[in-house]
Amino acid sequence: MPILNSKNLKNILITGGAGFIGSNLIKELLMNHKFNKIISIDNYSTGRKSNHHKNKKVEYVKLDCRKIFENKKVLNFKPQYIFHFGEFSRVVPSFDLAHDCLDNNISGTYNVLKYALRNKSKLIYSTSSMSIGDKKNENLSLYAWTKAKNFELIRNFDRWYGLNYTSVCFFNVFGENQISTGPMASVIGIFERQYRNRKPLTIVRPGTQKRDFTHIEDAVNGAILSAKKGSKKMYFIGSGKSYSILNITKKFKTKIKYIPKRPGEKFTGKAKLYLSSKELGYKSRYNLESYIKNFIKNTKI
């Protein structure tokens, strides 16, 4: 389903366009949708040039969201849609890198909101299931707190200034181009790397933590549907099924190793898809179990 009317081609700005979700979004837009031009801005803290798509309709700009008004090319661009995926995005590192998390997420997003208002753009904000917290506790970590406060700020910008927005709440996205090394690595990315290297899969104690996992293609589809149909709400994008971390590791059929508890750990997580299904027509098409089976089948160790 094309996101845009082919008779009225639109400009699209994507923050974090060289990152995991952003690069897959650009891939999908290039393959199946009509638009005028995409500009990706990324500070490349986790984004990679290897994620770039060579296409004359896509331009990559190395730029931090906090400096979005300092680049003439971006300043003169008039996007109808802004997909804001360029934020500090992990729980545990937010404790040690508190300044980076706070400055990137609060100051960076504030500038993106001003830019969206200036251009009368529709903002598609990527929040996180971690910002909901256990029992709606957003204070588990600085990362979760900043994501929750940014969504609150976005809603207030609508009340105060008439910001056009929608939000997608992703649940543990996995798949092509996911980060597998370093402090920003995702859990499935880490398990895949450990499996390839014949290392035990590391489980943060106690291992009973439950997560909903979302395939990258479902995440991208949810973001596009939200851009097209979403209206000033938060839409959950997930599979609607939760797995314990221990249960996931068992599907790899290899050795496991427990590691100490970490701060900010969330123990429950399952996407409630009623609103996304009703208003966006979203439906999860991929599941984690099949993905892991295919990964093991196609991985030689």
Model-derived features: positions:
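C-terminal substrate-binding subdomain of Rossmann-fold SDR/epimerase-dehydratase oxidoreductases
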Residues: 4, 64, 196-301
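Short, surface-exposed alpha-helical segments at coil->helix boundaries
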Residues: 49-50, 151, 189, 242, ...
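N-terminal Rossmann-like NAD(P)+-binding domain of SDR-like oxidoreductases, especially those catalyzing
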Residues: 1-173, 293-299
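Short aromatic-enriched loop/helix-cap "lid" or pocket-rim segments at secondary-structure transitions
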Residues: 49-53, 136-137, 178-183, 216, ...
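NAD(P)-dependent short-chain dehydrogenase/reductase
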Residues: 142-144, 152-211, 216-221, 225-227, ...
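Residue-level signature of the cytosolic catalytic core of signaling kinases
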Residues: 54, 138, 180-184, 230, ...
